[in-house]
Amino acid sequence: MITSKPKKRYAFIDVQNTASTTRKLLGFLIDWHKLYSYLTLKWKCEKVFFYSGIDEGDDETAKEFESLKGAGCIVKTRTVFSYKKPDKTISIKCIACGKENVEVVSMGYNHKSNCDVDLTVDAVEEAGPDKEFLIFTGDGDFDYLIKKIVEKGTKVYVVSSNAGIKKPGLNTKRLSTRLKEVMKQHEQGKIDLINIDSWKMKIQKEV
């Protein structure tokens, strides 16, 4: 009787996206050491990759990820840089006098670290029919990556949340529509969603 070898399981964690999902949407912070333990003990992950931007001078976060590296994680960090979003011009017409007033509104800054590139390169290099990947992100920019690694025979679990935020003037889902489309396009069992909500009691940070 021929038995198939168990597949190697790796985790790739988009730290910013995952942390934002649990904090803003689900109301809890992740203890990254607990998550690492859960992935290695419960899910039998042989490799766990963390990708994170770190603000210049943020020694506390830098030390935390050094500690994860010491525990056995593969940690890749980049310095966060900021760039200004284009200002928005609003034109308001006075009903009484008919005069048009133009106001320039600052839209603030975006913060990027370009860790997506590192995650993409590592995942493509590691992919193969003998692997299963847990990819922690809800970011639609990873739709093409997921297609490619599935084509290489790798089973993919997308770890995020399908929950949404509903407020007056705001109705948004954390899991990108593009990722949902990728899941629909593939046969059942090739790409599955794991709702990180269900892991809360195992991975949340005590505050």
Predicted regions and their residues:
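Nuclease catalytic cores that cleave nucleic-acid phosphodiester bonds
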Residues: 74-207
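Domain-level signal for Mg2+-assisted phosphodiester chemistry and nucleotide/NA-binding surfaces
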Residues: 1-107, 150-151, 155, 161-165
